[in-house]
Curated annotation (Swiss-Prot):
Region (Disordered): 1-40
Propeptide residues, chain positions: 38-40
Topology relative to the membrane: Lipid-anchor
Domain of life: Eukaryota
UniProt function note: Mating pheromone for A1 allele.
Lineage of the organism: Eukaryota, Fungi, Dikarya, Basidiomycota, Ustilaginomycotina
Compositionally biased tracts (Polar residues): 1-22
Coiled-coil ranges from the UniProt annotation: none
UniProt GO cellular component terms: plasma membrane
Lipid anchor positions (S-farnesyl cysteine): C37
Protein name: A1-specific pheromone
Species name: Mycosarcoma maydis (Corn smut fungus)
Length: 40
């Protein structure tokens, strides 16, 4: 599941990465931002 999410998040990784403080709420997708935090 993480692998698939990571691949899909890679395209929109710039957005959550820019706001690592609160990617959950700032990002359009809660799971996408969360995955970025966990993977990072």
């Amino acid at each position: 599941m993480l692998s698939i999410f990571a691949q899909t998040t890679q395209t929109s990784a710039s957005e959550p990465q820019q706001s690592p403080t609160a990617p959950q709420g700032r990002d359009n997708g809660s799971p996408i931002g969360y995955s970025s935090c966990v993977v990072a």
